[in-house]
Amino acid sequence: MALDLSGKVAIVTGSAKGIGASIAKRLAADGASVVINYASSAAVAEELANSINAQGTGKAVAVRADVSTIAGGKHLLEEGVKAFGKLDILVFNAGLMKNDVLANVSEKDFDDHFSINVKVPLFVTQAAVPYLKPGGRVMFFSTSLTKNTAPPPNYLLYISAKGAVEHLVRVLAKDLGAKGITVNAICPGPVDTDLFRNGKTEQQIQFFANLHPQKRLASPDEIAPIVAFLARDEAGWINGQKVYVNGGFNV
């Protein structure tokens, strides 16, 4: 049975493809109007929006915005509210993941990771608060790697940034919880996306797949349902949580 998100408006960053696209499709299938965000994949984003609109459940618009900058994130927020008149659900799916040895880590790498993963989501949340009413939802994306007692090498910046996200969620959950707005972190394990595959050999990809009991990577469509669940009214008592969706990756 579809979850009832009729009348809700959602903005999903980085949603032209991968996990973000699956989230957009699922929220729309459950009745929400969705703002699809892209930076360069205009044709892909428009095709996704058209396919959602053709299904006749939810609605969708595609908005170009560079969410690695605060200005770009605020532009996305403004265009989303302009398109649908309000905001109920804000999902920070866009992210950066680069693995490298410490000797090769640059100041730009550091700034890039913390900008798109931490700084922009924080300040877009700040800008979104006036639009979010009681029952509003803010969802950040972290990673199951922060739970590992033995994190993989060369993921220094990514894991550090996501660790910051998790603490940001804890504090925001209290600050915004007083307004009836929940804030949670979705923590997937390895998911078969371009972001995950980028810079890895097939041997490395298979290594991560073998850490799962089912010996495979997750698909984006296996992550989207938890976002749809947390978006529904019945999930209003779930707040400040790290929700692991990883197939037993680190049990």
Language-model segments: residues:
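Short, small/polar-rich loop/turn modules that mediate ligand/substrate recognition or access, typified
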Residues: 177, 182, 238-240
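Catalytic loop of short-chain dehydrogenase/reductase
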Residues: 139-164, 169-178, 190
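Conserved glycine-rich cofactor-binding loop
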Residues: 9, 16-17
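Alpha-helical segment proximal to the catalytic Tyr-Lys
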Residues: 130, 174-175, 236
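Short C-terminal tail/terminal secondary-structure segment
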Residues: 228, 239-251
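Substrate-binding pocket helix/loop in short-chain dehydrogenase/reductase
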Residues: 101-102, 106-114, 154, 204-208
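A conserved structural motif in NAD(P)-dependent oxidoreductases
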Residues: 212-223, 234
